[in-house]
């Protein structure tokens, strides 16, 4: 199993989990095709992490790309940056800028 992570990505975890659902239990080639045509920002981030995990497998262990499949995709919540927007009568409303930690684990297909 080969792992790649991206931390503190400025994508809401809720939206990133939608993109993660596109690639679960697929081969690496199929997952890359799914993410290529995804319109989500999280899809682009997950594709980079997937490519990194595949590169780890190919370069470190000489595994063929065709034999790899996505074993696990995890999207965890990172820290939340808090900002404020001014409102009427001296008030304020909070703006929460959420971040995500993305983890992709790939491995050889079970036969």
From Swiss-Prot:
GO terms for molecular function: rRNA binding; structural constituent of ribosome. One of its GO terms (biological process) is translation. One of its GO terms (cellular component) is cytosolic large ribosomal subunit. Pfam families: Ribosomal_L22. Keywords: Ribonucleoprotein, Ribosomal protein, RNA-binding, rRNA-binding. Transmembrane segments: none annotated. The keyword Magnesium does not apply. Part of the 50S ribosomal subunit. Belongs to the universal ribosomal protein uL22 family. HAMAP family: Ribosomal_uL22_B. NCBIfam families: rplV_bact. This protein binds specifically to 23S rRNA; its binding is stimulated by other ribosomal proteins, e.g. L4, L17, and L20. It is important during the early stages of 50S assembly. It makes multiple contacts with different domains of the 23S rRNA in the assembled 50S subunit and ribosome. The globular domain of the protein is located near the polypeptide exit tunnel on the outside of the subunit, while an extended beta-hairpin is found that lines the wall of the exit tunnel in the center of the 70S ribosome. This is Large ribosomal subunit protein uL22. It comes from Chlamydia caviae (strain ATCC VR-813 / DSM 19441 / 03DC25 / GPIC) (Chlamydophila caviae).
């Amino acid at each position: 199993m080969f792992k790649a992570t991206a931390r503190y990505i400025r994508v809401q975890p809720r939206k990133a989990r939608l993109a993660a659902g596109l690639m679960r239990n697929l081969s690496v080639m199929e997952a890359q095709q799914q993410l290529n045509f995804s319109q989500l920002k999280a899809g682009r981030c997950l594709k980079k992490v997937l490519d990194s995990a595949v590169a780890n497998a190919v370069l470190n262990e000489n595994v063929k790309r065709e034999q790899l499949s996505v074993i696990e995709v995890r999207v965890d919540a990172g820290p939340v940056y808090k900002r404020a927007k001014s409102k009427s009568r001296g008030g304020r409303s909070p703006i929460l800028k959420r971040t995500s930690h993305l983890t992709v684990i790939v491995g050889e297909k079970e036969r």
